[in-house]
């Protein structure tokens, strides 16, 4: 199992980005979270297979129908302790 932390900027808050991310992450059998940040970005921490993380990253560039992702930063991180994928 691998884990990654993504920071997304652009129009990613108030456009169902986190809810859509949760749906996609669950479909890919990932665990972790998606959280709004004070600076207007969204943090996504996800853990699972390397292929599932790649698929999530690819999908997240599109995000929800109303989102407009401007940039993505990906860094390795510790595997989250949660067994589910949550938004907050």
UniProtKB/Swiss-Prot annotation:
Reactions listed under catalytic activity: an acyl phosphate + H2O = a carboxylate + phosphate + H(+)
NCBIfam families named in the record: PRK14446.1
Enzyme class: hydrolase
Entries under Pfam families matching the protein: Acylphosphatase
EC number: 3.6.1.7
Domain of life assignment: Bacteria
Protein name, per record: Acylphosphatase
Residue ranges of domain Acylphosphatase-like in the record: 3-88
Organism: Xanthomonas campestris pv. campestris (strain ATCC 33913 / DSM 3586 / NCPPB 528 / LMG 568 / P 25)
Gene Ontology molecular function: any one: acylphosphatase activity
Keywords on record: Hydrolase
Family (UniProt): Belongs to the acylphosphatase family.
Catalytic site positions: 18, 36
